[in-house]
Structure formats: structure tokens, C-alpha cells
């Protein structure tokens, strides 16, 4: 391979480079170029090509989208040479492929001297944008990041020059999605590059080509490679503007009233709020009825006030040191925690006229500790609401860039997403990526290019978006909701933004990031950027903007005055669903837990009787025979039998029982055997699933999972 790389053709070099790129080795093939738009990078001279041996052909029916990767370029060239000399020398499927390709090219107008190699190289360029286009996207609102742009995005690498820009090329009509499927077999290179730049190198960078699923990739290509960018109506833009003003003015109001208070504000990522609201609106349109939200401290007060609608007067009262009612002090409702750890729940009306229940889970200072809590609560809500398709209850987790890359609980939670009896039908992850973790730069906080690279292990799509472009944030959030409801797997929205102040408002960030904060001090806010955009478009006037600002400030001032006399009258973040929740004092009283002997014998018979045609391991069969004798005689009952009887009687009483752990089905010491296996067919059988008539199969859940700790 080394000799081939040294003396081979341009395409051969490209093939080796792409092979190396699969191990994420970008250093040898990238260079920093100016971030402004350009089609052609510098051309590098290379030695004359030599032939490579013809690889073994693969039937066309077995090809996937990956046949367009770099190594296939050499493959196809050699196959074509062999086919031109003798069509019978290649597989029949390849013979049909070349005949079809040449036939279409010959009948397409405006193509003079066009070759299969040129078209295939053009398709490789298209694929390069789909794979690496995010590395050229304009993601950093501060413009400080020097982004290495891969040579793969340079048309010169594929043999194209500026004189080719207005030439028409045959790109074919392929069984893939995106603009290659639009039945336009002939396009100019300039038009193709413009479309690719527009789709993949704007203010959203899409990472999805690591997903080994044609249907999913095609679905995303159809969403990404649209003929024109997403255009919002005047009414829709007014809604987005209103939500962005609320987000911005809320932080400004807190900063003006409580200058020295810690609030971990959202300044620099105010677009999160309209993004979340639009995501929830879209989710409701797609059938979601309940969303469980987990997040840490950054922007939490803004989410509490603007998304889940905790009364503003209550938030302001907490800033002023307001107290809880006497009857709540010391009870299980939780007291004494800081205001940016508290949760709440709310039935939110959506833009589409629906209502969706939102629940923001209380969160400690331990970053990401809430992740498994949110996923577990979502799974529980799905069970108790009989949401078997997992389309009505959804989890949303909001992370910081440092914690998403650095906390092990994130990876552990991600890997629960597709396990049987743990999946919730997909969680939407939003990363508030302000490009600094407290005082730590990204280069010291992770070894990967993106903080979201950990999610690639799940084949989750990742949408990187410039946090200064509110419409791009809205689009990415809506697309995430559509993905989740379509494919029921995790998806990540990475909002690349900045933190206008320190980690908290009394911290001085210039101690450790002087260059960044010199830029931030003079950087225009996302609200001002959007207002200017709308004014230039003529869709919104200055009077319209002033009217919204006046309305928002008036409400904030009214709520501030009301906060001076505010006294909470209910347990703030416990909704009606928790009305019967018992206190520790009520739960800790001694209760009678015994059951009648005849009940024990009845359930004992159920959990020791196996189907007639079921063939367990002979040792397991002997264990169940011994258990039946124990239950019948009442003598020699061991721990495993006692445990099974306890679970069975809980099921008889209508309780949901769930066991989770790496080896819980069999038991670490081969003692439980709650799930047994037919030695001939491999069929599984769980006796505790058959304790009562017509028992819900999820009423008793026992499920192995990955190793958590030793």
C-alpha cells in the first residue's frame, strides 16, 4: 500500500487517504484555510498514475451507499478497463452497471467526451461533502476557531479545475436520496458545489454518515439537501422573535435587579429557549404528550421561567430570599436547595393548539447525575401509560460541552438507549456548547474533535449549529424531534455558542480566556443579529420589535412587584400526579407483609411449572423440581425460592416488579434462574410472567444490562 500511495494516481492516493480517514486520522490530510467561501483549494502536483490490480468484484445487489467511498474509485476504474476489453470478464451485475451508465451518458445532451471516471470522481466529491462538510460549516459565532478543512472537499483533488465550473457533468439517477435523486442527470459543477456548500457548510453541520443504515441516511439527505434553505413566514418569524426576546430580556432583568447574585445565566446561548419551544411544539404535532427534561445549572432559571412556566414572581421571590410556607418546612418536598436546582411541571399549550405535559426533574450540583433519572422516569411513564410504541412520552437532556465529553454517566446512559427493557424510544440531547468548561479550554477537556463524538458509538445523528443563528437552531431542534419520532433512537443537537460572563456572574473569565473575552465583549447578541435580519428583510418593523420588548418588560416588572408579597401555597414542583405521594413518616410505619399459605402454594406452583414441550438444561430442571418440593413441604426453602415467592405475591397484589443488572436473569451465583433457556431451540421462558391470568408481559421485568461496576 505504501508503494501504491507513493507512485499511484491521484485517485489511488485519494483511496488510501480515505482508508486512513476511517480511523479519524485527519492530521495528514487537512490544512487550515481561510473560512470564507471557496470552491477550489490549491492544486497539488502528483506523480503519474500506475495501474492497480483488479479487485474481486462484488455483486451489484450487495452494494450499499458505501460503494461511493474513495477506495471504490480505483476499483471501478480497473473494472471498467477490464469490461471495455471483454464485458464477459466482469460479473454480470457489473456488466449491466456499465452498460446502463454509458447508455445514459450517451443520450444526455451537453456532455462531450464525458467519462465514467469523471462522473465517479464527481460522485466522490458529493460523498466527501456528505461526510466532511460539517468541518467547513460556519459553527463558531465568535469566529475564533481555526477549522481544518479536509482536502477531500477540494475539487482539485478529484482532477477538477476552475475551467470545469461551468461544464455539465453526468451524475446519473441513483437509488439514493438528496439532490442526486431529483431526476436531473446533467448538472454543472458550479451548481453542484453551490448546492453542497448550501446544504453542508452553512450554519448547521450535519454528522450522519457514520450511521450504517441506508434508510436513515437517505431520510436525512432528503431533509438536508433541499433545493432552497428553510424559509419561515412572517408570522412564524414573529413567534421566534417573541421567544428570543423573552429569553434575552429575562436574563437582562435578573442581571439588573440582582447584580451580584449567582444565576448561571444563558447569555450567549439565548437561542436555546426558542429552539426548545419549537422542538416541543413539533413533538406535540407528532404525537408526544409528555416530556421529561433534565439539565444542569446553565440557563436553568431561563428554562424554568420561559419553557416550563414556573411563575416568574416565585423565581424573583427566591432571588429576594423568600421563604416557603411553614407546613412545607422539613417535609419530603425538599427544602434549602438553591433556586437553580429546583424542578417543576407544567401543562404547556403548543403553537399547534395541543397541550403537552412538561416535567423538569430536580437536579443536584453533580453534573449529568440527572441523566439516568430522566431516562428511568420516561420509561416508567411509558409503562404506566401503556405507551408500548414509546411515541407519547419522551426524554430531553440538556448538557454542557465539558460534561458531555467528560462524565462517564453520559456514556453509560447513552448505552442504555437500545438495550431491551431499557430503551425509551430515543432521547433528544441538547448540548449548550459554550466552548469552555468553567475555565478549561476544549483542547484540555477532550481528545476528540467534537464534544459530541461520544454519541457516535450509538450511530446517533449529530447536528452542530451556530448558536447566533436562531432560525438554524430552531430548524435543528425541529429536525431532532422528527428524527426521534421517526426512528425512535437518540439524536444530538450541539449548539455552538459562548458564555458572555464567567462560570457564574461574579467570576472573572479573563483570567484564563483573555482573547476569547476580548471578542465576546464586543460581540453582538443573537437577538440583535436576528432583529437586524428581520428589519433588512422588511417582514418586521422597528415598531413591531419595540412593541414586543415593551410587552415583555411590562410583564417582568409586574411579576417583580408581585414577588414582594408572594407566598407559595402549594408544593411547587409536585403536580397533580403526585397528589397521593406519601411522606417518609407515612411509609416507614411497620406494616404486615405476610400472605396466606394457600396463596404462597398457588403462586409457588405457577413459578415452578414449566411448559410441557420446554426443554431446559437438566441441571436447571432439577433445580425447579427441588423448588416445587420445597414449596409443597414448606421445608428447606432457600433464598432464591423466598425471593421468587416475594416477587410473585407482589405481582398478585398488582405491583410492578423490575430487576436490572448485568446478570440478574440467571443470578451471579446461578441461584435465581428467573429466565431459563430451551436447550434445543434457545427459546426463553420467565415463570414470573405467568403468575396471574392475562398478565401484562412488562408487569414483571428482569433484564440483563452492561456491567456498571464490580
Where are these regions (language model features)?
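Amphipathic alpha-helical transducer elements in NTP-driven molecular machines
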Residues: 119, 470-477, 527
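A mobile, often basic/glycine-rich helix-loop segment
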Residues: 514
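Conserved internal helical-beta-strand scaffold that buttresses enzyme catalytic cores
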Residues: 2-443, 447, 453-454, 458-463, ...
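C-terminal catalytic or substrate-handling cores of phosphate/nucleotide-
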Residues: 464, 472, 477-485, 490, ...
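Flexible glycine-/small-residue-rich
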Residues: 497
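Short gly/pro/ser/thr-enriched loop/turn and capping motifs at secondary-structure boundaries
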Residues: 436-438, 472, 500-501
Amino acid at each position: 500500500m505504501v508503494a501504491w500511495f507513493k507512485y499511484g494516481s491521484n485517485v489511488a492516493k485519494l483511496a488510501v487517504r480515505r482508508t486512513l480517514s476511517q480511523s479519524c486520522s485527519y492530521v495528514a490530510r487537512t490544512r487550515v484555510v481561510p473560512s470564507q467561501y471557496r470552491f477550489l483549494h490549491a492544486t497539488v502536483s502528483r506523480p503519474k498514475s500506475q495501474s492497480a490490480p483488479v479487485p474481486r468484484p462484488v455483486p451489484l445487489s450487495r452494494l450499499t451507499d458505501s460503494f461511493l467511498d474513495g477506495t471504490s474509485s480505483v476499483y471501478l476504474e480497473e473494472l471498467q478497463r477490464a469490461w471495455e476489453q471483454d464485458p464477459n470478464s466482469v460479473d454480470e451485475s457489473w456488466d449491466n452497471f456499465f452498460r446502463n451508465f454509458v447508455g445514459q451518458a450517451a443520450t444526455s445532451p451537453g456532455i462531450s467526451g464525458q467519462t465514467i471516471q469523471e462522473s465517479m470522481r464527481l460522485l466522490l466529491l458529493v460523498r466527501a461533502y456528505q461526510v466532511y462538510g460539517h468541518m467547513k460549516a460556519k459553527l463558531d459565532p465568535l469566529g475564533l476557531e481555526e477549522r481544518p478543512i479536509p482536502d477531500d472537499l477540494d475539487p482539485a483533488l478529484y482532477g477538477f479545475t476552475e475551467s470545469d465550473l461551468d461544464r455539465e457533468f453526468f451524475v446519473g439517477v441513483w437509488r439514493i436520496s438528496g439532490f442526486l435523486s431529483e431526476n436531473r442527470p446533467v448538472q454543472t459543477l458550479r451548481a453542484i458545489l453551490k448546492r453542497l456548500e448550501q446544504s453542508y457548510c452553512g450554519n448547521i453541520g450535519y454528522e450522519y454518515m457514520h450511521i450504517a443504515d441506508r434508510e436513515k441516511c437517505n431520510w436525512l439527505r432528503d431533509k438536508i439537501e433541499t433545493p432552497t434553505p428553510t424559509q419561515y413566514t412572517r408570522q412564524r418569524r414573529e413567534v421566534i422573535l417573541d421567544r428570543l426576546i423573552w429569553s434575552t430580556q429575562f436574563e437582562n432583568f435578573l442581571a439588573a435587579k440582582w447584580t451580584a447574585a449567582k444565576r448561571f445565566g444563558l447569555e450567549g446561548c439565548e437561542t436555546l429557549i426558542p429552539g426548545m419551544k419549537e422542538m416541543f411544539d413539533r413533538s406535540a404535532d407528532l404525537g408526544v404528550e409528555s416530556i421529561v427534561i433534565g439539565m444542569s445549572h446553565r440557563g436553568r432559571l431561563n428554562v424554568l421561567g420561559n419553557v416550563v412556566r414556573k411563575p416568574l414572581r416565585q423565581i424573583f421571590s427566591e432571588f429576594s430570599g423568600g421563604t416557603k410556607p411553614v407546613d412545607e418546612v422539613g417535609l419530603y418536598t425538599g427544602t434549602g436547595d438553591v433556586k437553580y436546582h429546583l424542578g417543576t411541571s407544567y401543562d404547556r399549550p403548543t403553537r399547534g393548539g395541543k397541550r403537552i405535559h412538561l416535567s423538569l426533574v430536580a437536579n443536584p450540583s453533580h453534573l449529568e447525575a440527572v441523566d439516568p433519572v430522566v431516562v428511568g422516569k420516561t420509561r416508567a411513564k411509558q409503562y404506566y401509560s401503556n405507551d408500548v410504541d414509546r411515541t407519547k412520552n419522551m426524554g430531553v437532556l440538556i448538557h454542557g460541552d465539558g460534561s458531555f465529553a467528560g462524565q462517564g454517566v453520559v456514556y453509560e446512559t447513552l448505552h442504555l438507549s437500545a438495550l431491551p427493557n431499557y430503551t425509551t424510544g430515543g432521547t433528544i440531547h441538547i448540548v449548550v456548547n459554550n466552548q469552555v468548561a468553567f475555565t478549561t479550554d476544549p483542547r484540555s477537556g477532550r481528545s476528540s474533535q467534537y464534544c459530541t463524538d461520544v454519541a457516535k458509538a450509538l450511530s446517533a445523528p449529530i447536528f452542530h449549529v451556530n448558536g447566533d443563528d436562531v432560525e438554524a437552531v430552531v430548524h435543528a431542534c425541529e429536525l431532532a424531534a422528527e428524527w426521534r419520532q421517526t426512528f425512535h433512537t437518540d439524536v444530538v443537537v450541539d449548539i455552538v455558542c459562548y458564555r458572555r460572563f464567567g462560570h457564574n456572574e461574579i467570576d472573572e473569565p479573563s483570567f484564563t480566556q483573555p482573547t476569547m473575552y476580548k471578542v465576546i465583549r464586543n460581540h453582538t447578541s443573537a437577538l440583535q443579529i436576528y432583529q437586524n435580519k428581520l428589519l433588512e428583510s422588511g417582514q418586521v418593523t422597528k415598531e413591531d420589535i419595540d412593541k414586543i420588548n415593551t410587552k415583555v418588560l411590562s410583564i417582568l416588572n409586574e411579576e417583580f412587584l408581585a414577588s414582594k408579597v408572594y407566598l407559595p401555597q402549594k408544593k411547587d414542583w409536585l403536580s397533580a400526579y403526585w397528589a397521593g405521594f406519601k411522606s417518609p413518616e407515612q411509609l416507614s410505619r411497620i406494616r404486615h407483609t405476610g400472605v396466606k399459605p394457600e396463596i404462597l402454594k398457588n403462586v409457588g406452583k405457577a413459578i415452578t411449572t414449566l411448559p410441557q414441550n420446554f426443554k431446559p438444561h437438566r441441571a436447571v430442571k432439577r433445580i425447579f423440581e427441588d423448588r416445587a418440593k420445597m414449596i409443597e413441604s414448606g421445608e428447606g426453602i432457600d433464598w432464591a425460592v423466598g425471593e421468587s415467592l416475594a416477587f410473585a405475591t407482589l405481582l398478585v397484589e398488582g405491583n410492578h416488579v423490575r430487576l436490572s443488572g448485568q446478570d440478574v436473569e440467571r443470578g451471579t451465583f446461578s441461584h435465581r434462574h428467573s429466565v431459563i433457556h430451551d436447550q434445543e431451540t434457545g427459546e426463553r421462558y420467565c415463570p414470573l410472567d405467568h403468575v396471574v391470568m392475562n398478565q401484562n408481559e412488562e408487569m414483571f421485568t428482569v433484564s440483563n444490562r452492561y456491567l456498571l461496576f464490580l
